[in-house]
């Protein structure tokens, strides 16, 4: 009906000036009319222009007064025509809100005499408020003074009305032609006889359910924010492929260490070796491995350059730390705080708690005269920001840190102490060959990203969190991460 009305009207008229007036004139629901207008516009039967008007609609209170009358009139009618009524008796006849507003407005209008007794001052009154509200419901316009009065009493609120003006489009016809909208086999076979609907490249498509952040990314952002709040700067960690030299040798890890075995490390076939290393630094590292130095006896073995040249997928982000500390040593010393959160790779058996690739969080501070007490203080500050205030430290061994400590936190839910990370002070055998001053110390700590994420989101199988088997619904539904709250 709406389509025939629009096309028929335009056949004899230049345009429809206002879709609202048109819908009222032809007794068509405006929402239905708008849908038909959009459809005809899509096929270019008509051209349209938007119309926006500020209209007024009744509030819930306004609707009530439009039906029952204004409070002042309700109060006036409750007062007897002759004589008077006590204020208490009058209050019993009316709702509390009606009585309160009615007293104010009726007194203001000088309709009643207010005291202990209430009596009428006029014989009859006209309920202008109710009349105005009813006319606003019908879409009629009012003078500014009346609108402001009703608005002040919170009986009406503004609303933007949207409609259209309509005129003939380039494809106008008194009757819509049937056009093919789907590229079916039958339609393609009869394409010469058919007219196809044009593509509307301006039309908005269905919202794409995308852009959800993975749980690991949310937790990673929280850790990054904590590091930044503590004054750390992020290290560049984009080189997944690293040489054995920076990954192992520069960290004073011997070449016969089990971690360097192919069973624990992914070595590259192409390119199998690195091209360039800082030769003077390589010589110092070789010397400290073979015969010691800087107060160390070394490992007393034949250090091989070909082992150091082998390329691999980095097994820890400490390889990045070694590069950054070496670069720092080549300039006049400046204290630094570094952190990184990125992927590392281990040639390990995959099970519900281990993957061949995972994420490592690492923080380090390089400054003069640092002690083990400084490390413990920083760790307590760092982990307290994660909501872990109960910490314990246990001596441990790492090839490149001495002393070394495992970090434990008391898990309230499990009711026991849980290992949450590793820490230590980088050895002089690692730092001094780089060229750092003798009084410079480096304290560092690290932990995985996956373990706290699994705890926060209640995941007990790491393969449900990371990898090709992750359920997309988990990514879409996982809540905002708030560490420490």
From Swiss-Prot:
Intracellular or extracellular location(s): Cytoplasm, Cytosol
Gene Ontology biological process terms in this record: phenylalanyl-tRNA aminoacylation
PROSITE patterns (UniProt xref): AA_TRNA_LIGASE_II (PS50862)
Cofactor(s) needed by this chain: Mg(2+)
Molecular-function annotations in GO: ATP binding; magnesium ion binding; phenylalanine-tRNA ligase activity; tRNA binding
Positions bound to L-phenylalanine: 318, 360-362, 400, 426
Keywords linked to the UniProt accession: Aminoacyl-tRNA synthetase, ATP-binding, Cytoplasm, Ligase, Magnesium, Metal-binding, Nucleotide-binding, Protein biosynthesis
Spans through the membrane: none
Reaction equations catalysed: tRNA(Phe) + L-phenylalanine + ATP = L-phenylalanyl-tRNA(Phe) + AMP + diphosphate + H(+)
InterPro entries found in the cross-reference section: aa-tRNA-synth_II, aa-tRNA-synth_II/BPL/LPL, Phe-tRNA-synth_IIc_asu, Phenylalanyl-tRNA_Synthase, PheRS_DBD1, PheRS_DBD3
Gene3D superfamilies to which the protein is assigned, alphabetical: 1.10.10.2320, 1.10.10.2330, 3.30.1370.240, Bira Bifunctional Protein, Domain 2 (3.30.930.10)
Superkingdom in the source lineage: Eukaryota
EC number: 6.1.1.20
Amino-acid positions noted as binding Mg(2+) in the UniProt annotation, renumbered to this chain: 402
GO cellular component terms attached to this protein's record: cytosol; plasma membrane
Family that this chain belongs to: Belongs to the class-II aminoacyl-tRNA synthetase family. Phe-tRNA synthetase alpha subunit type 2 subfamily.
Quaternary assembly: Tetramer of two alpha and two beta subunits.
Name of the protein in its database record: Phenylalanine--tRNA ligase alpha subunit, cytoplasmic
UniProt organism field: Arabidopsis thaliana
């Amino acid at each position: 009906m709406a389509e025939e009305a629009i096309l028929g009207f335009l056949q004899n008229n230049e345009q429809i000036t206002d879709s609202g007036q048109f819908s009222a004139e032809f007794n068509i629901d405006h929402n239905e009319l708008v849908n038909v207008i959009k459809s005809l516009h899509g096929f270019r039967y008509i051209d349209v222009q938007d119309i926006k008007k500020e209209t007024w609609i009744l509030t819930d209170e306004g609707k009530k007064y439009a039906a029952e009358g204004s409070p002042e009139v309700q109060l006036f009618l409750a007062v007897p025509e002759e004589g008077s009524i006590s204020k208490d008796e009058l209050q019993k006849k009316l709702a509390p809100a009606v009585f309160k507003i009615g007293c104010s407005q009726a007194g203001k209008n000088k309709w009643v005499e207010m005291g202990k007794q209430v009596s009428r001052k006029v014989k009859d009154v006209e309920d202008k408020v109710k009349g105005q509200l009813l006319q606003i419901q019908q879409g009629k316009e009012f003078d500014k003074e009346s609108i402001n009065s009703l608005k002040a009493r919170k009986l009406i609120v503004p609303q933007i009305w949207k409609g259209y003006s309509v005129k003939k489009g380039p494809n106008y016809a008194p009757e819509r032609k049937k056009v093919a909208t789907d590229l079916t086999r039958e339609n393609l076979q009869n394409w010469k006889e058919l007219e196809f609907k044009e593509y509307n490249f301006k039309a908005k498509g269905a919202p794409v359910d995308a852009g959800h952040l993975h749980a690991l990314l949310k937790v990673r952002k929280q850790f990054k924010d904590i590091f930044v709040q503590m004054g750390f700067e992020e290290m560049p960690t984009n080189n997944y492929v690293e040489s054995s030299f920076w990954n192992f040798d520069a960290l004073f890890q011997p070449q016969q260490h089990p971690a360097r075995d192919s069973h624990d490390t992914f070595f590259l076939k192409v390119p199998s070796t690195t091209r360039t290393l800082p030769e003077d630094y390589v010589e110092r590292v070789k010397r400290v491995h073979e015969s010691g130095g800087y107060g160390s006896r070394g490992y007393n073995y034949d250090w091989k350059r070909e082992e150091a040249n082998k390329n691999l997928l980095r097994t820890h982000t400490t390889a990045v730390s070694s590069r950054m500390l070496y670069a720092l040593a080549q300039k006049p010393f400046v204290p630094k705080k570094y952190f990184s959160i990125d992927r590392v790779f281990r040639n390990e058996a995959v099970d519900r708690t281990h993957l061949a690739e995972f994420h490592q969080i690492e923080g380090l501070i390089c400054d003069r005269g640092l002690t083990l007490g400084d490390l413990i203080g920083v760790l307590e500050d760092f982990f307290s920001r994660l909501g872990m205030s109960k910490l314990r430290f246990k001596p441990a061994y790492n090839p490149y840190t001495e002393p070394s400590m495992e970090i434990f936190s008391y898990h309230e839910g499990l009711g026991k102490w849980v290992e949450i990370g590793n820490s230590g002070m980088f050895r002089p055998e690692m730092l001094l060959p780089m060229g750092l001053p003798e009084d410079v110390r480096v304290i560092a700590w690290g932990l995985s990203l996956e373990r706290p994420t699994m705890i926060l989101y209640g995941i007990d199988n790491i393969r449900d969190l990371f990898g090709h088997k992750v359920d997309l619904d988990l990514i879409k539904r996982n809540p905002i991460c708030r560490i420490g709250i």
